[in-house]
From Swiss-Prot:
Gene3D superfamilies: 1.10.10.410, GatB domain, N-terminal subdomain. This is Aspartyl/glutamyl-tRNA(Asn/Gln) amidotransferase subunit B. Signal peptide: none annotated. It is an enzyme of class 6 (ligase). Transmembrane segments: none annotated.
Length: 476
């Protein structure tokens, strides 16, 4: 029997507001434990929540960017459960009237475009953070308690773990472009739970789903889903029954492990939040938020192809993160050739960042620095080999490319007389290479060019060297 996989994702995104959703407590990341909280966050008796309007604006902005319909009437509800990181024993969330519904985004997998529906986007407060010591007790930090979140729930339209990865990448990219969140999984500002079930191909009814947690990277999401897909298939093929449960992905064993039997929404006993009035969002408010949405990745990608003449692949890679795209834009504004700047960002820059496990904000390279380097290559002032030396200096120490080239004497040698002398010396020292080339061994030219580049410390102009080599060989 063959099965169809059905996947739905629940993504929690922390909003980048200066204060919490229902109190004036600040929201910086990395502060000392329990220093960014208040009596409202901790649910002391007699205190009342006050809704942060900016959190509503940010939620609307995210929902609009995800093509959601924005509610005119919305409200907050209490989600009742007890856990040490939830001091009030309830979470203020949205149940039956979310701020956004019926959205969608498009993903690309295997060269094909697919639309993934978004069921809803709703506002809620985050919980605190538990740290398990392993010594029989846990520590709780309430700094995160009350931080504004949006929960984005996809339709069960995802059919493969690869599609799930693509969906998360696209969702993160869109949210980052809006500016409402930095979406850093390592800091907890983007978290994901996955629901997965299998059903026989052709069957309309969904199978019993399991929920996956502890997915702290997109790669873990994909790996966890791949394992769960195999596990469920094995259970079903052996005549077993899938239980509705919550499992976690364990990287060490590369398996999913049972955490608990899954609760349904009824277990939370939702009811309207009595301390907050219903929220009315009129058309004027919606329009103001809509007007504040910047250019999104798909729009920017299209512009790069149509206006800058970039290949579709370049445009896709450059627009995947707002940081890279903004850097590219700034470099082009400073006079860099678009294609050359794209090549450097996708090549040398990305390779360096990956090797060092850094982001663009962590290095000394600036858009002006990259633009200066690209312009020197365009003018023929430096060769591509020398450019790599200059690049290393720029990304590690910063500075001006032209100044570095002059100070270090790295200007490309393009003087014909100087180059002809180097060519003559190389030919005199390597008569066998001349014979090899004349006998059809084209690699001999590459060897001779290498000798000249070595003699010139990489500063000889390669195209001119090739031209002069052929001229001199033909004379012999």
């Amino acid at each position: 029997m063959n099965f169809e996989t059905v996947i739905g994702l629940e993504v929690h995104v922390e909003l980048k507001t200066k204060s919490k959703i229902f109190s004036s407590s600040p929201t910086p990341f990395g502060a000392a434990a329990n220093t960014q909280t208040s009596v409202i966050d901790l649910g002391y008796p007699g205190v009342l929540p006050v809704l942060n309007k900016e959190a509503v604006n940010f939620a609307m902005k995210a929902a609009m960017a995800l093509n959601c319909e924005i509610a005119t009437d919305t409200k907050f509800d209490r989600k009742n459960y007890f856990y040490p990181d939830n001091p009030k024993a309830y979470q203020i969330s949205q149940f039956d009237k979310p701020i956004g519904e019926n959205g969608w985004i498009e993903i690309e997998v295997g060269g094909k475009t697919k639309r993934i529906g978004i069921t809803r986007l709703h506002l809620e407060e985050d919980a605190g953070k538990l740290t398990h010591t392993g010594d029989g007790y846990s520590l709780v930090d309430y700094n995160r308690q009350g931080t504004p979140l949006v929960e984005i729930v996809s339709e069960p339209d995802i059919r493969t773990p690869e599609e799930a990865y693509a969906y998360l990448e696209k969702l993160k990219s869109i949210i980052q472009y809006t500016g409402v969140s930095d979406c850093k999984m390592e800091e907890g500002s983007l978290r994901c739970d996955a629901n997965i079930s299998l059903r026989p191909i052709g069957q309309e009814e969904f199978g019993t789903k399991t929920e996956l947690k502890n997915l702290n990277s997109f790669a873990f999401v994909q790996k966890g889903l791949e394992h769960e897909e195999k596990r469920q298939a094995q259970v079903l093929l052996s005549g077993g029954v899938i239980q509705q449960e919550t499992r976690r992905y364990d990287e060490a064993s590369k398996t999913t492990i049972l955490m608990r039997v899954k609760e349904g929404s009824d277990d939370y006993r939702y009811f309207p939040e009595p301390d907050l009035v219903e929220l009315y969002i009129d058309d004027e408010w919606k329009q103001r938020v809509k007007d504040s949405i910047p250019e999104l990745p798909d729009e920017r990608r299209k512009r790069y192809i149509e206006e800058l003449g970039l290949p579709a692949y370049d445009a896709k890679v450059l627009t995947l993160t707002k940081e890279m795209s903004d850097f590219f834009e700034a470099a082009v504004e400073k006079g860099a050739d678009a294609k050359l700047a794209s090549n450097w960002l996708m090549g040398e820059v990305s390779a360096y960042l990956n090797a060092q496990q850094k982001e663009l904000a962590d290095v000394e390279l600036t858009p002006e620095g990259l633009a200066g380097l690209v312009k020197l290559i365009e003018k023929g002032t430096i060769s591509s080999k020398i450019a790599k030396k200059v690049f290393k200096e720029l990304i590690e120490k910063g500075g001006d490319a032209e100044k570095i080239v002059k100070e270090k004497g790295l200007v490309q040698i393009s003087d014909e007389a100087t180059l002809r002398k180097l060519v003559t010396e190389a030919l005199d020292n390597n008569p066998q290479s001349i014979e090899d080339f004349k006998n059809g061994k084209d690699r001999a030219i590459g060897f001779l060019v290498g000798q000249i580049m070595k003699a010139s410390k990489g500063q000889a102009n390669p195209p001119m060297v090739n031209k002069l080599l052929l001229e001199e060989i033909n004379k012999r």
